[in-house]
């Protein structure tokens, strides 16, 4: 609770707001939570190997390994176990659509299919951006403030002159990327009662799997630990009747040379071979012998997709890993030190990786722009939103 109260919603612009009596009274514990890896805290807390893996696996969604992630991030499991796991009906697309709806209602002009090519600066001041639209036409958009939600490495090293870069190429040479991922989007005929809404399949020696991904010579672990989501079990919006929607995440090294995925097996050969093995693994481990034959829709995504389509540094699926030196106030800040009026949000900056923290990064920036150095979150309106009705399927 203290981590959430004092360290998750702050830009660390004024450390005094986090150095309260409440925090100082537990300073020794905070320091231990920062320097001790999550795996050690979990090992002290529970003895069952399965529980240790369940409590350690959230490190993957922080772009790291439980053997590298500071144990402060056990707060992710705390949120899951205390607040429960929520699901937006209609899928996560609805979250993004809702944000867009709110923005447009507030008068925001959202321009999609447009690639920003340069942040325009004059005498060290950000004055706008240059972008190319879907037709290939170049435009210049003036602005009093520029906020980049793009990959921070891409923003700094391709949109700014070297003299304007707070985080130049040499900065990234010393950083550790979070893992990339092999993603499988599957449409499967028939029901899959063998799978829950959320299913985790763990390697027996999962430390070996993490060492394969984060070691000095990264390799793809085989077999791998998998996360499987079957939202169609609760949401009729995501699959036609008689079919299941299945999403699979396989953590793999951040290396674009592993390849890119595509639709219906047309991705790079290595990616498609890995996908075949993953489907076979799910089939074997969960007792669905005919799973491969029942797949009617298949799309794969690999590190090359993250690098080429999202400009992700080294093809990471998440951002810089949450190691000690890349967490909390050691992580890249949300304001440029070289260009006035240039700010950052997203998984590359504070507070870090994951959809909740990316959304919090926007909140932290709002506070910074307002001159609010408080450590806690902004007040929430908590207006209820009705769930969408099921869509007709062709």
Placement of each model-derived feature along the sequence:
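Rossmann-like flavin
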Residues: 1-68
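A glycine-rich dinucleotide-binding beta-alpha-beta segment and adjacent secondary-structure elements
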Residues: 48-62, 221-229, 283-351
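Active-site-adjacent "gating/activation" loops or surface patches in catalytic cores
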Residues: 53-86, 336-340
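Helical element adjacent to the flavin cofactor pocket in flavoenzyme catalytic cores
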Residues: 75-137, 144
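Mid-domain catalytic core of redox enzymes
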Residues: 117-240, 386
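Active-site-proximal substrate-binding core of FAD-dependent oxidoreductases
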Residues: 121, 370-394
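C-terminal segments that line or cap access tunnels to active or ligand-binding sites in enzymes
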Residues: 189-305
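A conserved FAD-binding loop/helix module that cradles the flavin
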Residues: 347-370
